[in-house]
Amino acid sequence: MKKKFPAISLSIACVAFLLLLVAVFGKDRMSPDMFKSMFAGFFAEKLTTEQLKEDYVYAIEDEGSKKIKILIAPGHNESSPGAAFLNLREVDMTSELGEEIFGLFKNDDHYEAVLLRGKNGDHPDFTEYFNRERENIARVRDRKRAQMKNYISDGLIRKEEPIPHVTVPEETSLRLYGINMWADEIGASIVLNLHFNDYPRKRINLPGEYSGFSIYIPYDEYGNARVSEAIAEKVLSRLLKYYFVSTYPKEGIGIIPDWELISLGANDTLKAASLLIEYGYIYEPQFKYSQTRKVLMRDMALKTYLGVQDFFGGTSTALSDTAILPYLWDEDISQGDEGKVSVLALQAALASAGFYPPLGKTRDDCPLTGVFKECTRSALASFQENV
C-alpha cells in the first residue's frame, strides 16, 4: 500500500495547483493549452503546441527571430543498415528520402533544417558531439533507464504492452540516445525519424504479409507527447491522400504511441516533438523499380513537408499536393508495363479523380505502384465509362 501514496500525493498536488491557477488567472484567461498541459502525462510538458506555433509566427514576422529548427534523421547507418529486401536496403532508402525532405525545409525561410545523415555519412557536428560526449551519453541513458524502472515499480507510471521491436545493439542504443541529446543541444523543435518497415518471415526473398505506412509518436506520459501527436495528425492526413495505413493490426490506427522507441525520446530523453514514420514495408511493389521509387520518394517527402506546414497553418497554395502530377504522357502505355513513371502518374491521376482504386478494391489491394495490372485496367475502364 505504501507504494501508492506518492501517486495519490501527486494527484492531489496537481488538482491543488490547477485550482490555484484558476483562482489567480480566472478560467476565461487561461488558454486551452494551459488546461490540457495539466493532464498531459507524468512528465512535465517540455514543448507545447502553442509555444511551437508562436515560434513559427515570430519566424515569419520578425527577421531577427530564430527559425524553427527541424532535424531530419534518416534511420540507420552503414554499421546498422536496417531492413533489406532483394537489392533494397533501408539505410539507402531513408537517405534518399531524407535528402528530399531536407531540401524542402531548407528552401523554406521559416525553418533551419539539419540533416543528420546524408550521402557522405553523419553530420560532422553530430560526429564530433558523439565522440566527445560518448561517456556522458551512456551515463544519462543508464540513469534515465533506472529512473523509469523506479517510476514503474512505484506505480507512478502505467506501463502498456508495447508493439514488438527489434532489440538494438549496445552501440546503436548509444547512438540513438546521442541523437536525442544532440537534438536538444542544437535546439531542435522537431525531429523527423525516417524508416521503412519489415516483417519477419521464413522466406526473406519473398514479400511479407503486411503493407502500408504508420507513424509512431512518444508515449502519452512523456513530455513531448502531445505536440508530437498534433504534428503527426497533420502528416497522417496528407499521406492518406495517396497511401494507406499499415495492415498490421497493431499499427492499423495510423498513429501509434510508443514508450520504448529511443528515437521518440524513450525514458523521457527528448524535448523536441518527434515522429518516427514508417513509410511502408520495404518489400512492397511500389519500391521495386528505381524510377518509380524516386518519384514516390519525392511525393512522400512533399506530403511530409506539407503535413508539418499544415500544423503551423502555413501551407502555400502555390504548392501542388503531389510530386507525381502534373505529368505529360509522351509514351504509349499498356497492360503489363512495370516500373514506369507514366503508369504511376496515370494511377495518381485516376486516384485524384476518384477512380483508383477501382470499385470493390482498397488501397491495400491497389497501391500506387507504376505497374499496369488489373487494378489500373479496371480503374481506367471505369473512368472512360463515366466521362
Segments predicted by a language model, with ranges:
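Catalytic-site microenvironment of enzymes
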Residues: 1-386
